[in-house]
Amino acid sequence: MSFSTRRQAYRAEKQDHRKELKHVKIDESVIEKVDKLSLPKKKFYRQRAHSNPFSDHQLEYPISPAHMDWSKLYPHFYDSEKKKMTKDVTIADIGCGYGGLMIDLSPEFPDEMILGMEIRVQVTNYVEDRIIALRTNHAKENGYQNINVLRGNAMKFLPNFFNKGQLSKIFFCFPDPHFKQRKHKARIVTDTLLSEYAYVLKEGGIIYTITDVLDLHEWMVKHLEEHPLFERLSEEWEAQDKCVSIMRNATEEGKKVERNKGDKYIACFVRLPTPDII
């Protein structure tokens, strides 16, 4: 059997699990029907490293945060009697890749709903299958119920998902550097986008950035420092923050940089209070 055929068969099997378990509350009744699930194999979900954020992707998104049905992604936090969510998403990993950061953040913030946004189809499918397997295999302790992923373009539709001041943390881990100058407008940090991030981030909330590309690091720092609603946090603060430690070592891209003995550049910024208009 060729690799292409094996890949198709593997994806079909995982798609069946995804259809059955993607939106259900994983509990003892599900365990009785489903054997322990193996974690997905990344080699069957290969896709290009980056995706053009300006392309006309076929994406589903709510017309406003009030129209977003979070119960499908976080059924454990849905009160069926009151027909409402018991919590809101407060942590977002923009361009979450293969989900390593979310998975390490999950036990550290068990009462926080964490969302990964990823634009690539197969990478999103991989993270969905990874979370389904983790939820199923850790059902007795309700493990990993607080994380999920959706396919979305944060550069276009972030305010469609989140209310003003809803988020407490936003992560940008190893984003596409877009090396060519004519592509800089596609970088995840720009003046316009920073105003959108400031809108969905609460006062005192944190933007976390990490990259192995010095030019991109300097670009993000420059734009964040020049924005009136963000202020850089000190290296001493970074050294004491557990999220920085997790971000440095949890992502698949970060592990790759570590193996290649590359540099990692980190910068964190706090959301300042919005000034009163006189």
From Swiss-Prot:
Pathway(s) this gene product operates in, as recorded in its UniProt entry: tRNA modification; N(7)-methylguanine-tRNA biosynthesis
Enzyme Commission number: 2.1.1.33
Binding site for S-adenosyl-L-methionine: 95, 118-119, 153-154, 173, 251-253
Keyword tRNA processing belongs to the record: yes
Superkingdom, natural source: Eukaryota
Annotated catalysed reactions: guanosine(46) in tRNA + S-adenosyl-L-methionine = N(7)-methylguanosine(46) in tRNA + S-adenosyl-L-homocysteine
Cellular component terms (Gene Ontology): nucleus; tRNA methyltransferase complex
One family name in Pfam for this protein: Methyltransf_4
Entry's localization field: Nucleus
Record key words, sorted: Methyltransferase, Nucleus, RNA-binding, S-adenosyl-L-methionine, Transferase, tRNA processing, tRNA-binding
Catalytic residues as annotated in Swiss-Prot or TrEMBL: 176
InterPro entries: SAM-dependent_MTases_sf, Trm8_euk, tRNA_(Gua-N-7)_MeTrfase_Trmb
GO molecular function, one term: tRNA binding
HAMAP family noted in UniProt: tRNA_methyltr_TrmB_euk
Family: Belongs to the class I-like SAM-binding methyltransferase superfamily. TrmB family.
Job of this protein: Catalyzes the formation of N(7)-methylguanine at position 46 (m7G46) in tRNA.
Self-association state and partner proteins as the record states: Forms a complex with TRM82.
The protein's name in its UniProt record: tRNA (guanine-N(7)-)-methyltransferase
Source organism of the structure: Kluyveromyces lactis (strain ATCC 8585 / CBS 2359 / DSM 70799 / NBRC 1267 / NRRL Y-1140 / WM37) (Yeast)
